Regions:
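Conserved donor-binding/catalytic core segment of Leloir-type glycosyltransferases
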Residues: 226, 272-290, 296-299
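Nucleotide-activated donor-binding/catalytic signature segment of Leloir-type glycosyltransferases, i.e.
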Residues: 313-336
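Short acidic/histidine- and often glycine-rich active-site loop of Leloir-type glycosyltransferases
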Residues: 320, 375-390
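Short alpha-helical donor nucleotide-sugar binding micro-motif in glycosyltransferases
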Residues: 340-345
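Aromatic "clamp/platform" in nucleotide-sugar-dependent glycosyltransferases that forms part
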Residues: 353
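Short hydrophobic beta-strand element within catalytic cores of glycosyltransferases
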Residues: 370-373
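Conserved acidic donor-binding segment of nucleotide-sugar-dependent glycosyltransferases
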Residues: 385, 389-396, 405-410
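A charged, aromatic-enriched C-terminal amphipathic alpha-helix characteristic of glycosyltransferases
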Residues: 411-445
Length: 447
C-alpha cells in the first residue's frame, strides 16, 4: 500500500513536470501504461567521475532532474567513491586505471585500454536497456571508447554527448588554443603536446589516434553533440564531427548557493582588505594557461596600498612562491566560503589563455561580481558590456586599465551581474533543456 502511494506521488510529480517539458499528460500516461511502471524512461550517463568536480556534478544534477521527472537514472563512472541520487556503476578499479595510464604513457593510446572493464560496462547497459545514453568525459584512463562505440552503433539507443573539452576530435590533446595548433582540422601528427595530458613519454601516435577516433565516432547514426559554449560548437563544425546535429547548452550554477553574501566585513578583516579594492582569481589548478603569471604581472601594475589580490586554488608550493601583495589560498571545499570570497571582491579577474566555458565566471556573476576575462574560447560568452570587460589575451596593460575602470570608475551597475546569472545561468533551467532534448528524442522514436 505504502509503495503504491509513493509511486502515485512520483507519477503525479512526473505529470506536473511533464507539462513544463512539452510532454502532454496523455502522452506521459500512455508511456507509463506501456511500460507498466512509473519510472517512464531510463537515463544512463557515463563520465570519468560522479558527483565530484564540475563534470561530475553536472552529471549528478542532470540525473536528479531526470529522477524528478519520473525517469530512472544511472551514472557509470571511472574513479572515486561518490554518493549519488542516481544508481552508480563503477567502471573498472584502481589497478585497471593505473594500468591504462601506464600503457597510455608508453604507447600513446589513451582510451584504447581497459578492455575488460568496458566489456563489463557494455553487459550492464544490455541488462539495463536504457532509453538514452548520455556521454560526458569518456577520457581519463578508465574506458575503451572503441569497444563502447562498437556496441552503441548497433544498439539503437539515442546518444547525447556533452563535450566539456576538445579531446573528442583531436589525436591527443584536450586543449590546443594555448599553443595555436590547428592540426585537428585535417589530421593530427607530430603532436607538439605529446607530454601534455594525456601524457605520452615515448610514442607519438597522434595521427593514428585521430584516424581511429574519426572512424569510431562517426559510425554512430543517432548521436547529438552538446557543446557547452558557442565557441566549442564552432570548432565542432570544422572537425570530423561536423555532420552531426549540434545543440549548445550552457552550464549553469546553483543560484541559491552562489548569491550575494550579506556579512562580508569579517572576511575582509581576516584577509586585511577593509579599505582596499579587492581582486579575486579562482581555479581548480593554477598554471600559466590559467593566467598565474598574468596575475603576478598585474600585481606589479597596481598599488598594494589601493588594491588587494586574492587567488584561490593554489598549491602550498605556489603560495610560498607568490610575490608580496598576493594572498594565496588553497582549494576550499566550502562552497559557502567560496561564495563569500566572490561577494567580497570588487571584481573577478579571469586571465585564462585556454578555456571552454569556465564555471567560475558564472559563479562570480551569480554573486553580483563583475568579470574581466581574456578573449579566450567560450570564456567571453558569460558576460556582456553590462557585466564585465573582455581583454585581448595577454595584454596586461589593458587588463590593468579594465580593473581600474570597474573598481574606481564603477562602470558596472550593481545588480546587473546577478540579473544576467538569473536569466541565463540558472542550473535548473539548463538541466530542463537536457530534459527537453531527451523528450524530443523519445517523441521522435514513438512517431
Amino acid at each position: 500500500m505504502e509503495k503504491n502511494i509513493s509511486r502515485r506521488i512520483r507519477f503525479e510529480q512526473a505529470l506536473k513536470l511533464g507539462d513544463e517539458f512539452g510532454v502532454t499528460r496523455q502522452e506521459l500516461t500512455k508511456r507509463v501504461l506501456k511500460k507498466e511502471k512509473y519510472e517512464v524512461y531510463t537515463l544512463f550517463q557515463i563520465n570519468v567521475v560522479a558527483n565530484w568536480g564540475s563534470t561530475g556534478r553536472i552529471a549528478e544534477e542532470i540525473g536528479q532532474m531526470a529522477i524528478k521527472c519520473g525517469w530512472k537514472s544511472y551514472i557509470a563512472y571511472g574513479r572515486g567513491k561518490p554518493k549519488s541520487q542516481s544508481k552508480l556503476i563503477r567502471i573498472g578499479n584502481k589497478v585497471d586505471m593505473y594500468r591504462h595510464a601506464l600503457i597510455s604513457r608508453l604507447l600513446d593510446n589513451h582510451g584504447l585500454n581497459s578492455n575488460k572493464a568496458t566489456r563489463k560496462l557494455i553487459d550492464r547497459i544490455r541488462d539495463i536497456k536504457p532509453d538514452i545514453v548520455h556521454l560526458h568525459n569518456i577520457h581519463g584512463y578508465f574506458l575503451n571508447y572503441a569497444l563502447l562505440f562498437d556496441f552503441l552503433k548497433d544498439a539503437g539507443i539515442p546518444i547525447v554527448w556533452t563535450l566539456h573539452d576538445c579531446w573528442t576530435f583531436t589525436g591527443h590533446c584536450a586543449h590546443f588554443i594555448f599553443i595555436g595548433c590547428d592540426k585537428w582540422k585535417v589530421g593530427c601528427k607530430h603532436c607538439p603536446q605529446k607530454l601534455s595530458y594525456p601524457t605520452s613519454w615515448l610514442c607519438d601516435r597522434s595521427h593514428r589516434n585521430y584516424k581511429i577516433k574519426k572512424m569510431v565516432y562517426t559510425s554512430i547514426p543517432n548521436l547529438i553533440l552538446v557543446p557547452v559554449s558557442d565557441w566549442l560548437a564552432g570548432l565542432l563544425r570544422f572537425s570530423f564531427m561536423k555532420e552531426y546535429s549540434i545543440r549548445r547548452i550552457y552550464n549553469g550554477v546553483d543560484l541559491m548557493t552562489f548569491s550575494p553574501q550579506g556579512n562580508t566585513l569579517q572576511l575582509r578583516r581576516r584577509i586585511g582588505v577593509i579599505q582596499r579594492y579587492m581582486l579575486i582569481g579562482v581555479a581548480s589548478v593554477w598554471s600559466a594557461r590559467k593566467g598565474l603569471a598574468d596575475f603576478v604581472a598585474l600585481r606589479r601594475k597596481l598599488s598594494i596600498q589601493e588594491y588587494a589580490m586574492v587567488l584561490i586554488g593554489l598549491t602550498q608550493k605556489q603560495i610560498q612562491e607568490l610575490p608580496q601583495g598576493i594572498v594565496g589560498i588553497s582549494r576550499t571545499n566550502s562552497v559557502k566560503e567560496l561564495a563569500e570570497y566572490y561577494s567580497v571582491a570588487n571584481v573577478f579577474v579571469n586571465p585564462t589563455w585556454e578555456d571552454n566555458f569556465p564555471t567560475t565566471n558564472l559563479e562570480a556573476l551569480a554573486c553580483d561580481t563583475p568579470v574581466i576575462t581574456y578573449q579566450t574560447g567560450g570564456s567571453i560568452e558569460a558576460i556582456d558590456e553590462k557585466t564585465g570587460i573582455i581583454v585581448p589575451t595577454g595584454d596586461v596593460e589593458i587588463l590593468t586599465q579594465s580593473v581600474r575602470q570597474i573598481c574606481e570608475d564603477r562602470i558596472i551597475e550593481e545588480g546587473q551581474c546577478r540579473k544576467r546569472a538569473i536569466e541565463l545561468y540558472n542550473k535548473n533551467d539548463r538541466y530542463k533543456e537536457y530534459m527537453s532534448l531527451y523528450n524530443e528524442l523519445m517523441n521522435s522514436l514513438h512517431k
